């Protein structure tokens, strides 16, 4: 099946990924974003979320790996590069210990010449047991080769 036939279709849903406190702490160290809502368990327990929460950018960073999992080699290229993100919104904080997954819908396919193709995918990072997603974004990928 040609990939353009899948425009408007759900490509799939990734596996659930636990947002452990260890993952959050590691991200805080890597990015030097050690705000108390992320790393101070005692203070966060008294805060608005009742526990620590993941950085929005940590949740966003999981999009790359989950996209690779969902899309796999269906794009028919040797490699895919991050091209950009449109309409990114952080909707619901992800509490420590929660699980997230990525639901992916192919929005568009645009040939860019020289064997390159620009793909636009609607990504929704869902939180297990929550009606509202963690984030929504239109993710752009450039496939080549």
Set out the residue ranges of the language-model regions.
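HotDog/MaoC-like acyl-thioester-processing domains
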Residues: 2-6, 93-145
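Hydrophobic alpha-helical segments of small multi-pass membrane proteins
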Residues: 58, 83-90, 121-127
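Hydrophobic beta-strand-centered segment that forms part of the acyl-chain substrate-binding groove
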Residues: 48-51, 64-105
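A generic structural signal for short beta-strands and their flanking turns/coil linkers
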Residues: 13-15, 23, 33, 77-86, ...
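Catalytic strand-loop segment that frames the active site of acyl-thioester-processing enzymes
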Residues: 1-54, 68, 145
């Amino acid at each position: 099946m040609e990939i353009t036939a899948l425009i408007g279709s759900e490509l799939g849903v990734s596996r659930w990924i636990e947002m452990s406190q260890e993952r959050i702490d590691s991200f805080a160290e890597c990015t030097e974003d050690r705000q108390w809502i992320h790393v101070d368990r005692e203070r966060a327990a008294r805060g608005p979320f009742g526990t620590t929460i993941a950085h929005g950018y940590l949740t966003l960073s999981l999009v790359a790996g989950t996209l690779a999992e969902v899309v796999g080699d269906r794009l028919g290229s040797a490699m895919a590069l991050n091209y950009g993100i449109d309409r990114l919104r952080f909707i619901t904080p992800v509490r420590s210990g929660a699980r997230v997954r990525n639901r992916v819908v192919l929005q568009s396919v645009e040939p860019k010449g020289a064997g390159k193709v620009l793909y636009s995918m609607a990504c929704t990072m869902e939180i297990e047991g929550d009606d509202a997603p963690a984030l929504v974004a239109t993710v752009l990928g450039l496939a080549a080769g």
